[in-house]
């Protein structure tokens, strides 16, 4: 149920996520994975890889001793703990992740130094659809690819890392550089936390946040020289075997790092996000009920206000349940810390939400 400044807006049941997934091992060296969103369109005829965006995963994996390979549609191996979590476990994403294109087609190569240290190198398409849909009338690059180097570390199950560095060909002569440092902490069986830092420097604004602020009425392309930075801290306290308290904070900035097209250099927006709530797990991992309070606050600088922007805040209260298959869903194709691998057919992950929404 949603309210806005005018009062009651809408009351309806809604499935945020509805996916079907199959993955498993054919033998000790060959595996497969397929996942599709059932509540997204299935037309991939105009896409660069000829695959609809409803398909997140469609590929084959090969394991050869310490090396692993995965070819096909897959998730970009960006760093960050939250980026790798199952989407149905996230009540509110940061703007950085919310505006990303996460599933593209290509090749991933992983080297497992041991059971606790892994390096990945990945080359994927940087686009799903045509370049014009993402960037406008700018001349397209002939190699629309994104290259990512990723380190996944595990230190005594107390401190874990998901760090990455990426470079992406956007349009001719323009690139995006993206860095993510994900840090997970298991202080005790009851206390768990993660802290993510993300930075994106984009020759052409791929996220679209700066473009929406500065406007492109006299341009047929996205803004140039956008810069985004995000900090995310999430803490869990499992105060009882079936009960969990959580709190989350986010701080993000959107800036222009070099003036161009009459767009002034400097910061345009600061965003704060916060969430807190309680979760109840009647079973070990298959289902949980929740009550969550989520707030966002957006503050614009004077240069953004001169372009017509104004500060605003949103509040959403959510309550209901998550259901998913027992086999957890990870963004990374190589779950190298798992000892037992077996063929699994996952039931659809369903997220149905009742909300109270307020915007000021």
What is each PLM-predicted segment?
Residues 1-2, 7-129, 152-155:
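Outer membrane beta-barrel
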Residues 4-8, 47-48, 157-340, 354:
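Outer-membrane beta-barrel pore domains
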Residues 12, 40, 45-50, 99-104, ...:
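Solvent-exposed loop/turn segments connecting transmembrane beta-strands
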Residues 16, 54-56, 103-105, 145-147, ...:
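Residues that flank catalytic or metal-binding motifs in active/ligand-binding sites
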Residues 44, 340-351:
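N-terminal amphipathic/hydrophobic targeting modules at extreme N-termini
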Residues 83, 120-122, 130-135, 162-164, ...:
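A short secondary-structure junction signal
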Residues 128-130, 136-140, 151-154, 158-161:
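Solenoidal tandem-repeat scaffolds enriched in leucines and small polar residues
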Residues 332, 346-347, 352, 359:
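Secreted/luminal cysteine- and crosslink-motif detector
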């Amino acid at each position: 149920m949603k309210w806005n400044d005018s009062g009651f807006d809408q009351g309806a049941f809604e499935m945020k996520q509805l996916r079907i997934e199959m993955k498993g091992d054919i033998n000790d060296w060959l595996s497969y994975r397929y996942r599709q969103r059932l509540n997204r369109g299935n037309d991939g005829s105009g896409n660069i890889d000829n695959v609809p965006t409803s398909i997140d995963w469609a590929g084959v994996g090969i394991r050869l001793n310490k090396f692993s390979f995965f070819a096909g549609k897959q998730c970009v191996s960006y760093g960050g703990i939250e980026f790798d979590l199952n989407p149905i476990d996230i009540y509110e994403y940061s703007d950085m992740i919310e505006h990303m294109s996460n599933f593209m087609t290509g090749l991933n190569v992983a080297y497992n130094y041991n059971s606790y240290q892994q390096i990945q190198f990945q080359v994927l398409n940087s686009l799903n659809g045509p370049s014009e849909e993402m960037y406008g009338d700018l001349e397209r690059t002939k190699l629309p690819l994104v290259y990512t180097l990723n380190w996944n570390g595990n230190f005594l199950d107390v401190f874990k890392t998901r760090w990455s560095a990426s470079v992406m060909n956007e349009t001719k002569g323009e690139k995006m550089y993206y860095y993510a440092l994900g840090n997970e902490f298991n202080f005790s069986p009851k206390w768990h936390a993660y802290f993510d830092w993300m930075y994106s420097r984009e020759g052409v604004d791929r996220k679209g946040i700066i473009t929406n602020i500065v406007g492109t009425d006299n341009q047929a392309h996205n803004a140039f020289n956008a810069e985004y930075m995000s900090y995310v801290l999430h803490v869990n306290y499992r105060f009882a075997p079936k009960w969990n308290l959580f709190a989350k904070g986010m701080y993000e900035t959107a800036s222009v790092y070099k003036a161009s097209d009459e767009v002034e250099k400097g910061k345009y927006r600061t965003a704060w996000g916060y969430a807190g709530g309680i979760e109840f797990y009647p079973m070990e991992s298959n289902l949980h009920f929740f009550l969550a309070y989520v707030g966002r606050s957006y503050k614009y600088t004077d240069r953004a206000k001169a372009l017509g922007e104004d500060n605003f805040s949103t509040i959403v209260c959510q309550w209901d349940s998550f259901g998913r298959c027992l086999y957890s869903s990870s963004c990374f194709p190589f779950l190298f810390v798992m000892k037992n691998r077996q063929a699994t057919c996952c039931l659809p992950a369903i997220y149905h939400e009742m909300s109270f929404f307020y915007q000021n």
